Amino acid sequence: MSGRAGLRVGLGLLAGGQVVLGLWIVLLPELFWKWPWVSHLPPYNEHLLQDFGGASLALAVVLCAAVATMERRLVLTALVACLVSSVTHLLFHARHLEPLSAASAAGFMALLGAAVLLPAVLVWLAADGTALREPGSAGTGGRPG
């Protein structure tokens, strides 16, 4: 798999994850709240959940645009936005693991760690523009000659 294809697949995975998460929260906020990794946190607040779901869907739009265009600045912007969201999410949950069993906390941190690692690796892959070039477009950084 080429760097460009790998980058596109990774962006697609991130976008798909945000779509699923966002739709779940927007359409079924109480069901999302009942998830064991969420329900032990501060009291249920539908407004905040709807905002979080909407923000997840908004991030999905930017990630989908990056997948569609593979334009360097948009790809990097989308990935950095995803990374900021993932890092802050991980840091919050890392401070609130007490109610979880050791196995559940370890699984949760592994999942959140992967949500940080994937966009970080993709930023590294996209940073110099090589992976964004169309096959046969040497030196254009993915932009038309």
Per-range role (PLM):
Residues A114-G136:
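Membrane-water interface at the C-terminal end of transmembrane alpha helices
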Residues F52-G54, A103-L117:
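Individual transmembrane alpha-helices with interfacial aromatic-anchor signatures
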Residues M1-Q18:
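Cytosolic juxtamembrane helix and N-cap/initiation of the first transmembrane helix
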Residues A68-C82:
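Loop-to-transmembrane helix junctions at the membrane interface
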Residues A78-H93, G113-L117:
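Hydrophobic alpha-helical membrane segments
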Residues G16-L48, G53:
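Hydrophobic transmembrane helix segments
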Residues Y44-V67, V84:
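Core segments of alpha-helical transmembrane spans in multipass integral membrane proteins
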Residues L91-G107:
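Membrane-helix boundary connector in multi-pass membrane proteins
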